[in-house]
Amino acid sequence: MKRLKLILRRTYLTSTGVNCSFEISRLSRIGKINEARKFFDSLQFKAIGSWNSIVSGYFSNGLPKEARQLFDEMSERNVVSWNGLVSGYIKNRMIVEARNVFELMPERNVVSWTAMVKGYMQEGMVGEAESLFWRMPERNEVSWTVMFGGLIDDGRIDKARKLYDMMPVKDVVASTNMIGGLCREGRVDEARLIFDEMRERNVVTWTTMITGYRQNNRVDVARKLFEVMPEKTEVSWTSMLLGYTLSGRIEDAEEFFEVMPMKPVIACNAMIVGFGEVGEISKARRVFDLMEDRDNATWRGMIKAYERKGFELEALDLFAQMQKQGVRPSFPSLISILSVCATLASLQYGRQVHAHLVRCQFDDDVYVASVLMTMYVKCGELVKAKLVFDRFSSKDIIMWNSIISGYASHGLGEEALKIFHEMPSSGTMPNKVTLIAILTACSYAGKLEEGLEIFESMESKFCVTPTVEHYSCTVDMLGRAGQVDKAMELIESMTIKPDATVWGALLGACKTHSRLDLAEVAAKKLFENEPDNAGTYVLLSSINASRSKWGDVAVVRKNMRTNNVSKFPGCSWIEVGKKVHMFTRGGIKNHPEQAMILMMLEKTDGLLREAGYSPDCSHVLHDVDEEEKVDSLSRHSERLAVAYGLLKLPEGVPIRVMKNLRVCGDCHAAIKLISKVTEREIILRDANRFHHFNNGECSCRDYW
């Protein structure tokens, strides 16, 4: 009877101990370590399992100091207790402490050794892991797998292969890992040999082999293997689909996608990205719209597709929809939207994205800083761009180039030169891109002497050989300064063949300074280089029109029709209340506020006439009467956008207008005068640069 009571008590204590250990572990797993400790302290009888559980709980909750204190208080320890201490330190990335405990252990088993090997592998200390592995008194299947898997993860495929061949038991997990490692190294045929030799394969093995073929651009072989796969899962279907999308075979991908029995989010995302890369925006949007569930990558892929194709308005629209649905934009999404904001000059959205980046602490990255600076520069907010630049004590070359390019596009040559001369003292030497930016700045600001000095010292001072882009900037600089003959001499002295940008710069100078003789030479060279470029025809027509050579204008226009060359349509846009309004020449018929815009145009036209404005009809090349030409000029897209800005934006707020082409001379003169008669600041970004109009003056000083 006494013996029976003893057995029952031991059974009770053991079962109670197991239950207590379970409760401590449960509380620890859900982060309630303090409750676990209270429960532990309340135990009248603390079994060794309970001690091990609470020590492990402290480690799991990132409290190694408290775990060690409890371990030291244990009156009795077994090998499980010591293993728990080693594993706990390893979980907390404290490999030195783990090794010290390992050396102090009164006894070790295969779990102790394997834990240390795994710990060293986790820390990237492969040499120590190998040394310990080969010292192990005995190894089990887990030991081999840990060492083998660590070598594969570290990219040591040759060593992994040798170890694989030595393994006493090659289970399906080990073989699958070996196949994956070999495929990542491009050794796909070697991987296939292992695959074919396997007696047992699971769905992961098949998918790994298919993925290996896909990663090595052998999509057709992957498809053959996929077709004979005994059991296909969502992952295997998706892997095969990715093979088509990542290799650019979007038609095959589309066909495969249609027959997929399940269409997981990752597969739909792949199709959106694939369609986006080949410009099939409507198909990408159809996939997007049909999705029941979307993740961050879905929105990012669709926004990127719009951005890549130049559908900036749709990208902004989608970003707004994303916010309404409470989806937090990812870093790549924010960068894509910043690029869109820069293109559209959408300052309000740009500021909003900047705030997102600050909240997510992404704004301390120099790459992000460069993108932000570009956005602010293109929105006409140069002061904000400079503030971003000044935040960084250590700047990379891209940041320097961004701010110099920004000053250049705004015609602020002095500021650009100041920044340029600060570069060497900061430890950053100008590169090819920097020199293009500073030469452009000198050209736009009329800094001929400084610009020529930089150009002539490029090789000796900065070790940069002039490229065709540098020559183009210098030709433009000379041409803007009226030194058209010297510009031609520079072209003739070039050691590299001048391209269309060089001849285009000369042709632009010929227009500004009425050099019809050299204009014909430049135009001929441009027609040879870019026979389909409508800009050359238009510029030559404009030069002839300015000299009233209407017969020559007609010849140029006829040649355009003969060669099927059409002029790229001009458009301008303005952001009002987080909405971008787009205008084309004369194109306000579909605008909901058409009548009010026309009234504002009539009002400004009247003010201009009173101020003595005389339209320059040479900028209208159509064969129509003078009255129609005058009316056509006032309907240029930039004039429509300015009128809308006057109509909608309150006084004191700058009117920011963007245009995809170079502003014509008449619109430039008209907007200058509009800024005076309306007492409004107008900022116009055209294809070449920024124009800041204020009180009848322009920042370009009519030098553009």
Swiss-Prot record:
Main location: mitochondrion
Pfam families hit by this protein: DYW_deaminase (PF14432), E_motif (PF20431), PPR (PF01535), PPR_2 (PF13041)
PPR repeat windows: 16-46, 47-81, 82-108, 109-143, 144-170, 171-205, 206-232, 233-267, 268-294, 295-329, 330-364, 365-395, 396-430, 431-465, 467-497
GO cellular component terms listed in the entry, alphabetical order: mitochondrion
Chain intervals for the UniProt region annotation (Type DYW motif): 610-704
Transit peptide interval: 1-12
A GO MF label: zinc ion binding
Residue segments, region Type E motif: 502-577
Record flagged with keyword Ribonucleoprotein: no
Chain spans, region Type E(+) motif: 578-609
Alphabetical GO biological process terms: RNA modification
Protein name stated in the entry: Pentatricopeptide repeat-containing protein At1g56690, mitochondrial
Annotated source species: Arabidopsis thaliana (Mouse-ear cress)
Encoding gene (name): PCMP-H69
